[in-house]
């Protein structure tokens, strides 16, 4: 069974839409195999988004991700990576299809409500970043 990582970002946590977002996952066949609410440190955010270190938005992304708590979860199901990405919608909420998480809950391309792994390989890396094996069930 495929697994993917999801992060409900600070903007969506602050808006109080955690339950609505989790319901989208579950009602579309994704099981929550693990979940926790965390306040990322600057170092954690920098390490998690290290792939973007040379990009002009890196500093703002890190600052945003540490601006409040996030909800990190492992979603499990058939085609979990692609299913989650379809549910999230385009990175820019203005381009996201109606009914997607970002179209419904995101504020901007920066405060875009959710993160999801973009491949099985990255899902494995991202899951290991946040979860110990005994936390996944």
UniProtKB/Swiss-Prot annotation:
Keywords: ATP-binding, Cytoplasm, Kinase, Magnesium, Metal-binding, Nucleotide metabolism, Nucleotide-binding, Phosphoprotein, Transferase. It comes from the Bacteria. GO terms for cellular component: cytoplasm. Major role in the synthesis of nucleoside triphosphates other than ATP. The ATP gamma phosphate is transferred to the NDP beta phosphate via a ping-pong mechanism, using a phosphorylated active-site intermediate. Its main location: cytoplasm. SMART domains: NDK. This is Nucleoside diphosphate kinase. It catalyses: a 2'-deoxyribonucleoside 5'-diphosphate + ATP = a 2'-deoxyribonucleoside 5'-triphosphate + ADP; a ribonucleoside 5'-diphosphate + ATP = a ribonucleoside 5'-triphosphate + ADP. It is found in: Cytoplasm. SUPFAM superfamilies: Nucleoside diphosphate kinase, NDK. Its cofactor is Mg(2+). The gene is ndk. Belongs to the NDK family. It is an enzyme of class 2 (transferase). It comes from Campylobacter jejuni subsp. jejuni serotype O:2 (strain ATCC 700819 / NCTC 11168). Signal peptide: none annotated. ATP binds at residues 9, 57, 85, 91, 102, 112. Homotetramer. GO terms for molecular function: ATP binding; metal ion binding; nucleoside diphosphate kinase activity. One of its GO terms (biological process) is GTP biosynthetic process. Its EC number is 2.7.4.6. The active site is at 115 (pros-phosphohistidine intermediate).
């Amino acid at each position: 069974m495929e697994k993917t990582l999801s992060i409900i970002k600070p903007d969506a946590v602050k808006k109080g839409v955690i339950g609505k977002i989790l319901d989208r996952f579950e009602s579309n066949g994704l099981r929550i195999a693990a979940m926790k609410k965390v306040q990322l440190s600057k170092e954690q955010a920098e390490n998690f988004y290290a792939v973007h270190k040379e990009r002009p938005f890196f500093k703002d992304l890190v600052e945003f991700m540490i601006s409040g708590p996030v909800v990190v979860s492992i979603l499990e199901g058939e085609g979990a990576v692609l299913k989650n990405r379809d549910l999230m919608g385009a990175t820019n909420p203005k381009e996201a299809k109606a009914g997607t998480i970002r179209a419904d809950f995101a504020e901007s391309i920066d405060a875009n409500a959710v993160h999801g792994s973009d491949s099985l390989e990255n899902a494995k890396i991202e899951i290991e970043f946040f979860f110990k094996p005994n936390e996944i069930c």
